[in-house]
Amino acid sequence: MRPSERLLNRLWAHEKASYGLRVFIALSTWMALCWYRDDLQPLPSLFLGTIASAIAETDDNGWGRSKSVLLSLLCFAAAAASVVQLFAWPLPFAAALAVAAFALTLLGALGERYASIGQATVTLAIYTMIAMDQHHDTAIAWREVAQMLAGAAWYGALSILWTLLFANRPVRERLARLFAELGRYLQLKADLFEPVRHEDLRARRLALAEQNVRVVEALDVTKAAILSRFGRSGRPGVQSGLYFRLYYMAQDFHERASSSHYPYEALAEAFFHSDVLYRCRRLLSLQGLACMALGQAIRLRHGFDHGERNRQAGQDLEQSLQYLRQQHNPHWRRLLGSLQLLAANLSGIARQLSEASLADSPLDGIDTRLRDSSPHTLREMGARLRRALTPGSLLFRHGLRIALALIAGYALLRLAHPDNGYWVLLTIMVVCRPSFGATRLRLVQRVAGTLLGLGAAWALMQLFPDTTLHLLLALAAALLFFVTRNERYLVATAAITLMALLCFNLLGDGYVMIWPRLLDTLIGGAIATAASLLILPDWEGRRLHQVMAQVIATSTRYLDEVLGQYRNGMRDDLPYRIARRDMHNADVALSVALANMLREPQYARGNLDAGFRFLALSNTLLGYLSALGAHRAQAALDEDSLVSQGQHCVQQALTGLAAALEARHPAPPADAAEAMLADALEQLPEDIGDKSRLVRTQLALILHLLPGLRAAADAAVATARPAPAVASAA
């Protein structure tokens, strides 16, 4: 393949290429049509309609996408017509604006599809307000509404056609991203095995926890893509079998990579003068690179080779372990057992990587069902909406904040009558987020992006007055907005600001829009921030104990599930995968909550240090439990009374801690028998089986971890303030 063809292939395979090309085709079609007719007047409205339709787009199959497009167009038409009819009546208009914003925000309880449609509908309604404000002529407003709906319909039709032509491409893209994130996770995990004394392991563990958030998000997005294409029946066909196997392989990699077989500090101290930990680190790092290469192979649809370096690194590790065993050091006996399990874990990853090219083999005997939490009937949808219609629901409070903030913004417009003031409402809509931390971050990005976009627009209009060039620049800016709007919002804001000014400059003097746009952004951002700060604020610190309780509760359920498989035999079935995914999702929720707390006012944060200590300890707990899951196989656990006692003691302690956290009570006092039981579990007989040895060791490690978990939980609860009960909105 020639270099130019290789470059085009890589560009086409890029995750954003499909989305960007759809937007480019839709916008360039309208641009060419308006240019051909020598009439640029409809272009801004056509662009805005296309943008609203693209914002409403979510990943789905052909039938689902068709339903989404039809629902979007109906919502767009109803919203735009309501704006035109009520615009001259301030009080009914304000009431309708608040009710519509609240109701459309509450649609998010039904899932991502409805949340996107709701956000896009409010956005198009504000676009219609801007049109009414500029022309004050109902006939012109109806014409621009029709143009916006035409732009939305054209993009919707293109989106449906694209889904039919490239039905499985989104699944490949998400699998490729998943393996890339897993590769980065493995490389960060490898850094923990560097046997360097006095190293800041806490910073490395926090970096690993942040990457774990990305891995879990990638797993959830990939599962949603598979569900939308192949359903939840668990009967994949020949073509979809490849995607199912790769997804389950990624889940297994994540469990193996998350596992911890012994405290890293103890391993580093014991084997400081050996190369065994460097061998572990090298193999894990190479496996991370192999995962990234597998993701690239999935994206480019190329073959994948595990690589000779990985095989050699595995052999080197085994030889290093063999040398240590030959030393017959009694102090290393237990640690060498943990290292042997670690080597077996890495060997499992290596084996599956070497078989990745055979991933289209039959899925006989594998439970391929997936949990689908989306509502599919009117009864399920009604139940979701009823749960969201309570003051304790985060979505209810967010919708109320947006509604009241929009009323405040509209009242300010009626009192001050600023030029082009409806951009204030648009800023409120995009800046106001469910949490104060997210709102604060979005405000900074919006203001900085607006300043950058206004500066770029002024410079480009000064340097290049040619209309044709303005059209091309507006098209490029719109494309940049969609490519960056989810990952780099500051750049996306600059791009959409540039596009807006260039489009309005085609119809008049774009320079007069610069200062009003900046002023409206500042006013809207201030109102959105005040709403997040004053109207039923959702401080993460006030409900941190609930998030921590969920972490402990899901860990307890997972422990029960995994030990059941040691007694009854390994089954990678749906209940086990649900318990594992719930545990990881709870861990991610704690990481996200603590990250949001860092952006909250000092008085609302609570004890951040205790929260991060608890996060580090809960990640360690997750690692110990994942090690049990990674090596699960049937073993005679019922014959070992200490294992039964250890399981009962751990489950009782974790259940009590979860209940105390949920109620914001101090953790139950430690039982003196816990330490004695942990010591007894660590006394391993010579003839004990490998699986029983593992279960004993992991239960003992968890028992040793309990005092630290209780202390961190008590410190967090002692400084937390009461929070209202939170109802699930999804």
Could you tell me what each predicted segment is?
Residues 1-24, 28, 32, 36, ...:
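Long, hydrophobic alpha-helical segments that serve as membrane-spanning/inserting helices
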Residues 467, 475, 483, 490-498, ...:
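C-terminal functional regions that serve as terminal interaction/effector modules
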Residues 1-166, 170, 333, 337, ...:
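Alpha-helical transmembrane segments and their membrane-interface boundaries
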Residues 527-540, 544, 560-567:
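Membrane-helix cytosolic exit motif
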Residues 101, 105, 152-156, 180, ...:
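Residues on a specific face of well-ordered alpha-helices
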Residues 615:
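Catalytic-loop region of hydrolases
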